[in-house]
Amino acid sequence: MKNNEFDFLYYVYKNGLDGYRKIAQSTNISLGVISKLANKFKEIEALDEKGLTPKGIELLKPYKVDNAIIMAAGMSSRFVPLSLEMPKGLLKVKDEILIERQIKQLHEAGINDITLVLGYKKEMFFYLEKKYNVKIIINPEYNVKNNCETLYLARNILKNTYICSSDDYFTENVFDEYVYTSYYASIHVEEKSDEWYMIKNNKNEIIKVNKFGNDGDIMLGHVYWNHEFSEKFRELLIKHHELGDYDDSLWEQLFTDNIKKLPPMQVKTYPSDVIFEFDSLDELRRFDEKYVKNTPSKIINNICRLFNCSANEITDFKPIKEGLTNTSFIFKLNDKLYVYRHPGDGTENIINRKHEKKSLELAKKLNVDPTFIYMDEKEGWKVSEYVKNVRIPDYHNFEDTKRILKVLRELHEHNLTVDWEFLPWEEALKIEDLLNAKDPSTMRNFLPLKEKIAKLVEAVKGDGIEKRFCHCDTYAPNWMLTDNETILIDWEYSGNADPGCDLGAYIMDAMYEVEETEKFISEYLQ
């Protein structure tokens, strides 16, 4: 079936045969062609005076949408702080929950077979299964793989399928019960951005995708795959899942790299006021004024209480790369930048926040960490000053090493003590127990190393080293170097310990050879 034949039949299916001129205006097909199409379909008894006959509906059958997949596994880290408290798809925008609005729009279009692929805070979505009769697939690797994994997990249900993101907002219903061919939704922009720009041929088919651009049709919103496209893309998903070379990639990257091997996908351009994706709280505030004065966020409320400010004064949220145990973001207040540290799930099992707070206060007093402002010892959140133009030390730059060791030497020479200890061996055994409880197989390769460390622990017990206040987690990411300052941050594991812990943590992460280690220790002992 040709495109204009499909457009004619689908229009009549939805609206009836309500005048050739109106059909021509709505489908952008000339009046003469509409007349010819009507005569053609009447001749084969696909059309009568009322509209499509059963035979006409049968002609549309290959183009009927089978189902929809809504991707909702990721954390949406750019959407801090709200994404730290709930998945972005569950935000209420214009008084409707994003993913619920999308499910209802799919239902209105006659698409009832809907599957959600979940990961981050998945339990918060489970109510949708009963409320809207949706199906659920769990992506357990959402935090280490990108959405190629999500689609791989859903590979067996790829047919005539809508691929949607849970956090899109459509001001009008963009879904159809029947679709002619595969397409990627788009809006046309005339300014430079970091979006993905689709280059198309004279058939409106995507022939190339550029990351970044000055103007053009950008990838934005939902996607539709027909049976042919789904079959070929499923083969790619299976192949590259085995190779693992696209684990960190968006599915669009896999598409971009294989455009010439895949069935055609068109660009479907919408007006700029139809499709919205909110990449930050600031963008959402511009769309929904409710979030300006009353942002429903415990984190925002924490900041407001600390600084005695209103929510609309807090702006410019930017995520910082996730740490091993926590997630942090930058925010601006009164033209000054700060860092908010949000404790990771489960960290209460390995970190004593009361001890951490006392350590931070002591480190600030010693000017080892002058950035500290406040920490809530019950909930574990922390606010610090943001330091511009910082870098971490280069393990193989000895000038950096000397700066690090000067700070550690001075810290140890204070010979301070606190009322708790950090015991590396005992703490490691606690973490081992936690990991074993979750998945015993993760520790198999650790046992030979554990036996060696156990002997070392016994050997150093008789050293007679006087314990004192130490940081105990001195690897490079916990240092901030400026032209004039050497700052040691993140005191979660601090306490009374052998000062060798502070040297050993740095040496271990640097993976120094014996000669470099001896040089490092000699510099410390000067």
Task: Give each language-model segment a name.
Residues 7, 171-246:
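Conserved core of the sugar-phosphate nucleotidyltransferase
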Residues 51-84:
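N-terminal nucleotide-binding beta1-loop-alpha1 segment
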Residues 123-196:
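Conserved beta-loop-beta/alpha segment of the NTase-like Rossmann-fold superfamily
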Residues 264-371, 463, 483-486:
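Conserved NTP-binding catalytic cores of kinases and kinase-like/nucleotidyltransferase enzymes
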Residues 298-313, 416-472, 522:
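An alpha-helical support segment within catalytic cores of ATP-dependent transferases
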Residues 318-332, 339-340, 455-501, 515:
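Active-site acidic catalytic loop and adjacent metal/ATP-binding pocket
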Residues 318-423, 440-447:
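ATP-binding pocket architecture of kinase catalytic cores
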Residues 500-526:
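Active-site activation/catalytic loop segments of kinase-like enzymes and analogous catalytic loops
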